[in-house]
């Protein structure tokens, strides 16, 4: 008798992806973040769907509709805070996932890596548009400042900004279209995640040693389903602690004031997960230069496979590159801190040094370290 999961057309796909998938026997907990990102996406789509049932994308009623959700809808406060903190959780997992990819050289799988970068851009776009929807002070001014950056594009900039706004300022048309895009993009992200998995399963997973593991593979189920389940339990414990005890920890108090175009907040800043890129943007005095640096701060990830000089894939046995990696992590944390500070000394110069260091580590120090390590190993 044939096993149904191996013959049924639909179940066969699930089987090849999650049950009988040959997986390296030595992948660590750092490989859990892919499945955790899938869980975050499910939480966001589910909670977002229920929020959309009660939300109205209109400048006059958007803020009060969010208040209505929190006060009058059954467990509306819970759904709202799950959605808001779910975004933070999504980005925590996302950055850890990318960090693991850099540390263990997973960027060698070019297709998977490039789809991942597209996923990062899509997620950032979705999160930005979602932040505009509650129509608080930081929603309005964040939308105004960030969309205005496009006006730095030569010749077409101003027209492009007005086209995105649907008028001459951020208004009802902007809010309406942002809601439409914010609703559809997570489904596009889900589809792209499938493509991400498809390309990954073409090559098989990387492993901490960064060496081929064809001789030592084990089935995904039950070994890694159990391991993923442990990750999911820990993630949910952290998530619900955040949602139920510290729901406003990562938010901005300014967003509890309704949007007012006549009153600018003292410090306009995006959510915490964009602060590192925002700090890079602010560290360049020129508007166009800042926008280019902002885009390159993410797009630079696409260069990693092309500027790798080391003969070893993983950083596991490369102490110089390891030091540079953790220096890069520290630098991103410094940039995140600077992004939330006002534009005044000494924060300006700290931000400029940290921004320069960010690009220098990736473009110069890491490739040079790879060559030095090759020499040390007489390769």
Swiss-Prot record:
A ubiquinone binds at residue 201. GO terms for molecular function: metal ion binding; ubiquinol-cytochrome-c reductase activity. Binds 2 heme b groups non-covalently. This is Cytochrome b. The keyword Metal-binding applies. Heme b b562 binds at residues 83, 182. Component of the ubiquinol-cytochrome c reductase complex (complex III or cytochrome b-c1 complex) that is part of the mitochondrial respiratory chain. The b-c1 complex mediates electron transfer from ubiquinol to cytochrome c. Contributes to the generation of a proton gradient across the mitochondrial membrane that is then used for ATP synthesis. Keywords: Electron transport, Heme, Iron, Membrane, Metal-binding, Mitochondrion, Mitochondrion inner membrane, Respiratory chain, Transmembrane, Transmembrane helix, Transport, Ubiquinone. It comes from Dipodomys nitratoides. The gene is MT-CYB. InterPro entries: Cyt_b/b6_C, Cyt_b/b6_C_sf, Cyt_b/b6_N, Cytb/b6-like_sf, Cytochrome_b, Cytochrome_b_C_euk/bac, Cytochrome_b_N_euk/bac, Di-haem_cyt_TM. Its cofactor is heme b. GO terms for biological process: mitochondrial electron transport, ubiquinol to cytochrome c. Its main location: mitochondrion.
């Amino acid at each position: 008798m044939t096993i149904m999961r191996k013959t049924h057309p639909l179940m066969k796909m699930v089987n090849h992806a999650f049950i009988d998938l040959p997986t390296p026997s030595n992948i660590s907990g750092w490989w859990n973040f892919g499945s955790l990102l899938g869980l975050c996406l499910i939480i966001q789509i589910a909670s977002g769907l229920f929020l959309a049932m009660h939300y109205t994308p209109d400048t006059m009623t958007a803020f009060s509709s969010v208040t209505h959700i929190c006060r009058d809808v059954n467990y509306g406060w819970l759904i709202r805070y799950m959605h808001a903190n779910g975004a933070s959780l999504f980005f925590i997992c996302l950055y850890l996932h990318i960090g693991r990819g850099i540390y263990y050289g997973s960027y060698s799988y070019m297709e998977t890596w490039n789809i991942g970068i597209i996923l990062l851009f899509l997620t950032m776009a979705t999160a930005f548009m979602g932040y505009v929807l509650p129509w608080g002070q930081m929603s309005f001014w964040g939308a105004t400042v960030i969309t205005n950056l496009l006006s730095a594009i030569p010749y077409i900039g101003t027209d492009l900004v007005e086209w995105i706004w649907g008028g001459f300022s951020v208004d009802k048309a902007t809010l309406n279209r942002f809601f439409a895009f914010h609703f559809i993009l997570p489904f596009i992200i889900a589809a792209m995640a499938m493509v991400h998995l498809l390309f990954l399963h073409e090559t098989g997973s990387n492993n901490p040693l960064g060496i081929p593991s064809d001789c030592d593979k084990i089935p995904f189920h039950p070994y890694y389903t159990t391991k993923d389940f442990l990750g999911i339990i820990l993630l949910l414990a952290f998530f619900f602690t955040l949602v139920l005890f510290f729901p406003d920890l990562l938010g901005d108090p300014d967003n509890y004031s309704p949007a007012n175009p006549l009153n600018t907040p003292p410090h306009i800043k995006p959510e915490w997960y964009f602060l590192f890129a925002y700090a890079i943007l602010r560290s360049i005095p020129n508007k166009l230069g800042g926008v280019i640096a902002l885009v390159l701060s993410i797009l630079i990830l696409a260069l990693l496979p092309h500027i790798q000089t080391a003969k070893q894939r993983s950083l596991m046995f490369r102490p110089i590159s390891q030091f540079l990696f953790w220096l890069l992590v520290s630098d991103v944390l410094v940039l995140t801190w600077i992004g939330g500070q006002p534009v005044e000394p000494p924060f300006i110069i700290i931000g400029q040094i940290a921004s320069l260091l960010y690009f220098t580590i990736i473009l110069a120090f890491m490739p040079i370290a790879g060559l030095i390590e090759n020499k040390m190993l007489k390769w």
